[in-house]
Design a protein with these regions (language model features):
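Structural signature of beta-strand start/N-cap positions in the alpha/beta core
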Residues: 34, 49, 83-85, 147
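Short, surface-exposed beta-strand/loop micro-motifs that present aromatic residues
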Residues: 175-182
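Short acidic low-complexity segments
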Residues: 35-46
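Beta-strand-turn-beta hairpins that frame and shape the catalytic cleft
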Residues: 145, 182-187
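Acyltransferase
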Residues: 2, 186-233, 241-248
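Pocket-forming structural segment of enzyme catalytic cores
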Residues: 96-173
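Extreme N-terminal starter segment of soluble prokaryotic enzymes
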Residues: 7-12
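Cysteine-nucleophile active-site neighborhood
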Residues: 55-127
Length: 248
């Protein structure tokens, strides 16, 4: 992990009632970052990496983000190619929409989230291999086909002529689905790194290292004004989380 003397990038974790925020915050803190909960646009301030975690369905998730006034700022963040990590539902929300409930989502990735097929047992819960399609700094010092933890019934399917360039890794459980994507500073994973043991922490550490090397925030590039924020106190919480209550 990153030595404590190095700069700790500020990470904003979107709190919209659909994620295990404390475990995500704890994992990021272990990885060398500082964590802040994002509940309104003004909380973004000097955040360097925006993380959208989550479990559940797309429609209520988008409704909560809209009610918090965060849909526009998140879209602006993505359009500005600022550092972003979507985890599980957070990855699915990057697509145009979801077949689960017909919701229109953030539209950063052309394609839709569709139910797993090909004989997969639903929901797909547990450890499974992540097989890389290409090398990427997020998987540095992580062996190919390493096991990560999944909890979901749907997965995003990129479309269009450049869809293949977006995919970092795939996983097979009855059928193959996209388990990691990257485009510029936009990252997304279907697995839960905060629940995936040493490899999950290594993944988060790699992301934090990428943000650190990229430098601090350019205030002029921020899509929202700086405002008061809620810091996360997660130091006493275990990284491993209890069983989830809902499944995407």
């Amino acid at each position: 992990m990153t030595p404590a003397r190095e700069r700790r990038p500020l990470v904003g974790i979107v709190d919209y009632g659909a994620g295990n925020l404390v475990s995500v915050a704890r994992g990021l803190e272990i990885a060398g970052a500082e964590a802040r909960l994002i509940r309104r646009p003004e909380d973004l301030g000097d955040v360097e990496l925006l993380v959208v975690p989550g479990v559940g369905a797309a429609a209520p998730a988008m409704a909560r983000l809209e009610a918090a006034g965060l849909v526009g700022p998140i879209r602006a963040w993505l359009e500005a190619d600022r550092w972003f990590l979507g985890i599980c539902l957070g990855l699915q929300l990057l697509f145009d929409g979801s077949d689960e409930d017909g919701a229109e989502t953030l539209g950063a990735i052309r394609g839709r989230t569709r139910i797993l097929s090909g004989g997969a047992r639903l929901p797909h819960i547990g450890w499974n291999q992540v097989e890389r399609d290409r090398d990427h700094p997020t998987f540095e010092e992580i062996p190919d086909r390493a096991d990560f933890y999944f909890v979901h019934s749907y997965a995003g399917r990129p479309e269009g002529p450049t869809a293949g360039e977006l995919v970092l890794a795939e996983t097979t459980d009855g059928s193959s689905f996209i388990s990691a994507v990257a485009r510029g500073r936009m990252l997304g994973v279907q697995f839960h790194p905060e629940r995936s043991g040493p490899y999950g922490l290594r993944f988060l550490g790699n992301v934090v290292d990428m943000v650190r090397r990229d430098g601090g925030v350019d205030a002029a590039a921020s899509p929202v004004e700086t405002g008061p924020a809620v810091e996360v106190a997660a130091s006493a919480v275990q990284v491993a989380a209890p069983a989830v209550e809902s499944v995407v």
